[in-house]
Amino acid sequence: MKFIDEARIEVIAGDGGDGSASMRREKFVPFGGPDGGDGGRGGSVYAVADRNINTLIDYRYSKKHQARNGENGRGSDCYGKGGDDITLRMPVGTIITDMDTGELIADLTEHNQTVRIAEGGAGGLGNLHFKSSTNRAPRQKTDGKPGERRMVRLELKVLADVGLLGMPNAGKSTFISSVSNAKPKIADYPFTTLAPNLGVVRVGPSRSFVIADIPGLIEGAAEGAGLGHQFLRHLQRTGLLLHIVDLAPFDETVDPVAEAKAIVNELRKYDEELFSKPRWLVLNKLDMVPEDEREARVAAFLKDFEWDGPVFEISALTGQGCENLCYAVYDYLAEHSDAQRAAEAEDLAADVRFRGQQQGDANAPVGPQE
C-alpha cells in the first residue's frame, strides 16, 4: 500500500432539523393546543485513532465527508430523528488542524482515541415550547442550526522512540532489519527507502522500543532536494536520534566527514527543536575496513567531525556491535522515561489542589474548592 502522510479534506456536520408549528386536532378536543415537535440534531463528524492503519491514503482521494441532517419535527409531539454521525478512522499519530484558523483540533496519540472534529447543528424548537398562560396557541417555532463546516489538514507523524538519520546508502535499512522485525527493501543504490519504516526492537521479555527509518537525506534537503525533507516530521516525536555514517563508502571520492556535517546542517535548517534532540553517532560498515586501519580511521573521523557525544561502532550487515547499541538505547530511553515521570510527579506535588494529601490529611478534598 502506498504511504501517504498528508491529506486535506472537508468535513461537514449535519444541519439540525426545523421545529414544527402544529396544533392538536382531535375529535372532542376543541382546544387541543400546540403539539409541534422539535427538529432532530445534525450528525457530527468524529476522528478515531486506529493502530491497524498506517497511511492516510483513504483521504488522499476522498475529499468530502458529510454527516446527515436532522429530520424536521412533526405534529402530535413527534420529534425529528437525529442525523447519523460518521466516523473517520485514522492512523495513530495523526495531527488534525483547521486550515482556516490554524487551530490544532486533535493529536491522535492513542489507539481508539475519539475526537469530534465537526459538531452537528442543534434541532429547532417546536411551538410546543412557546405555550404560555397568555399565548395558548403559539405559531412561532425555530429553525435548526447549521452544522460545522471545516477544511482540515491531516498530517501523520509516526510514533517512534528512536529515529535513524543518514545519507542514502548509509546502511539504515540494513540496520533496522538486523535489529528488529522490519523488512524494508535493501539494495546497493541510493533512495532504496521511499517511505518511513517502523520496527520493534526487543531486548528482553516486555522490554522493547520502536525505531523509525526514513529515506536518506542529501545536501539541500531542507530546501526540498531529495526525499528526506518531507519525512523529517516523522522524527519529531522521537526521544533519540541515531546518526548513521558510512565509514567505508564504495566511492573513494566521498568524504564521510563532509556527508555527516551536511546531515547536521540540514537538520538545523529544517527544525531547530529537532536539531537539539539527543543524538548519537553510529559508525557503520566497519566490516569493510581492514582491522589494522579501523582504530585510526575512527579516530580521524571523530577528530575532523569534532564530535564529543556517544559513539558506537557497528556493522549492520554482520550484526557486530548492534546488540550493545540496542541495550544502550533501551537503557537511555528507560532512564529518561523515569526522569520524565518523576518531573510530572513533582509538578503534581506542587499543585495546590493536592496539598491536603501531602500533609497526611485523609479527609482533605481533591480538586478545586467551592
From Swiss-Prot:
<keyword id="KW-0963">Cytoplasm</keyword>
<dbReference type="GO" id="GO:0003924">
    <property type="term" value="F:GTPase activity"/>
</dbReference>
<dbReference type="Pfam" id="PF01926">
    <property type="entry name" value="MMR_HSR1"/>
</dbReference>
<dbReference type="GO" id="GO:0042254">
    <property type="term" value="P:ribosome biogenesis"/>
</dbReference>
<keyword id="KW-0547">Nucleotide-binding</keyword>
<feature type="domain" description="Obg">
    <location>
        <begin position="1"/>
        <end position="159"/>
    </location>
</feature>
<feature type="binding site">
    <location>
        <begin position="166"/>
        <end position="173"/>
    </location>
    <ligand>
        <name>GTP</name>
    </ligand>
</feature>
<feature type="binding site">
    <location>
        <position position="193"/>
    </location>
    <ligand>
        <name>Mg(2+)</name>
    </ligand>
</feature>
<dbReference type="GO" id="GO:0005737">
    <property type="term" value="C:cytoplasm"/>
</dbReference>
<keyword id="KW-0378">Hydrolase</keyword>
<dbReference type="InterPro" id="IPR014100">
    <property type="entry name" value="GTP-bd_Obg/CgtA"/>
</dbReference>
<dbReference type="InterPro" id="IPR006073">
    <property type="entry name" value="GTP-bd"/>
</dbReference>
<dbReference type="GO" id="GO:0000287">
    <property type="term" value="F:magnesium ion binding"/>
</dbReference>
<dbReference type="GO" id="GO:0005525">
    <property type="term" value="F:GTP binding"/>
</dbReference>
<dbReference type="InterPro" id="IPR006074">
    <property type="entry name" value="GTP1-OBG_CS"/>
</dbReference>
<comment type="subunit">
    <text>Monomer.</text>
</comment>
<dbReference type="Pfam" id="PF01018">
    <property type="entry name" value="GTP1_OBG"/>
</dbReference>
<keyword id="KW-0479">Metal-binding</keyword>
<comment type="similarity">
    <text>Belongs to the TRAFAC class OBG-HflX-like GTPase superfamily. OBG GTPase family.</text>
</comment>
<feature type="region of interest" description="Disordered">
    <location>
        <begin position="127"/>
        <end position="147"/>
    </location>
</feature>
<dbReference type="InterPro" id="IPR027417">
    <property type="entry name" value="P-loop_NTPase"/>
</dbReference>
<dbReference type="InterPro" id="IPR031167">
    <property type="entry name" value="G_OBG"/>
</dbReference>
<dbReference type="InterPro" id="IPR006169">
    <property type="entry name" value="GTP1_OBG_dom"/>
</dbReference>
<protein>
    <recommendedName>
        <fullName>GTPase Obg</fullName>
        <ecNumber>3.6.5.-</ecNumber>
    </recommendedName>
</protein>
<dbReference type="InterPro" id="IPR036726">
    <property type="entry name" value="GTP1_OBG_dom_sf"/>
</dbReference>
<feature type="binding site">
    <location>
        <begin position="213"/>
        <end position="216"/>
    </location>
    <ligand>
        <name>GTP</name>
    </ligand>
</feature>
<feature type="binding site">
    <location>
        <position position="173"/>
    </location>
    <ligand>
        <name>Mg(2+)</name>
    </ligand>
</feature>
<feature type="binding site">
    <location>
        <begin position="284"/>
        <end position="287"/>
    </location>
    <ligand>
        <name>GTP</name>
    </ligand>
</feature>
<keyword id="KW-0342">GTP-binding</keyword>
<feature type="binding site">
    <location>
        <begin position="315"/>
        <end position="317"/>
    </location>
    <ligand>
        <name>GTP</name>
    </ligand>
</feature>
<feature type="domain" description="OBG-type G">
    <location>
        <begin position="160"/>
        <end position="334"/>
    </location>
</feature>
<keyword id="KW-0460">Magnesium</keyword>
<dbReference type="InterPro" id="IPR045086">
    <property type="entry name" value="OBG_GTPase"/>
</dbReference>
<feature type="binding site">
    <location>
        <begin position="191"/>
        <end position="195"/>
    </location>
    <ligand>
        <name>GTP</name>
    </ligand>
</feature>
<comment type="function">
    <text>An essential GTPase which binds GTP, GDP and possibly (p)ppGpp with moderate affinity, with high nucleotide exchange rates and a fairly low GTP hydrolysis rate. Plays a role in control of the cell cycle, stress response, ribosome biogenesis and in those bacteria that undergo differentiation, in morphogenesis control.</text>
</comment>
